Amino acid sequence: MLSSIEAAEITKLAKEENLNADVFGPLAFDNSISKKSAGIKGIKNLVAGEADVLLVPSVETGNALVKMMIYFMGACAAGVVVGGKVPVVITSRSDEAQARLASIAAAVVALD
């Protein structure tokens, strides 16, 4: 799968750039958030089951994941696109005020 190849490339690039972060992939969602699932599948990595950030292969995948976290888990989501000249705040028309504020705060942090 293309997304698995891209995740492996991101992992390799992160190691080459010597980032101050643990980056590992590809990981299925369960292996990203559950040490038990990762252990059953024999995945041995610091990130497995402990991921703080999840990268997704498309905006549609990310949208579905975030909506599930909001509506099933009570999460507050912040949306910001980085990589351009300035960060771009991304919100949903149905976002609560807390999520809108979190998105603005994330964009401000991304400015540095």
What do these predicted ranges mean?
Residues 32-33, 62-67, 97-99:
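Short active-site-adjacent structural elements
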Residues 28, 59, 93-95:
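Short, ordered loop/turn segments at secondary-structure junctions
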Residues 2-52:
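Active-site rim loops that border cofactor/substrate pockets in soluble metabolic enzymes
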Residues 37-84:
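A C-terminal functional module that forms or caps the active site or interfaces directly
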Residues 68, 75-112:
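C-terminal functional extensions of proteins
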Residues 22-26, 57, 82, 90:
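General beta-strand structural signal in soluble alpha/beta enzymes
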Residues 2-9, 41, 69-74, 104-108:
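Short, solvent-exposed amphipathic alpha-helical segments in soluble enzyme
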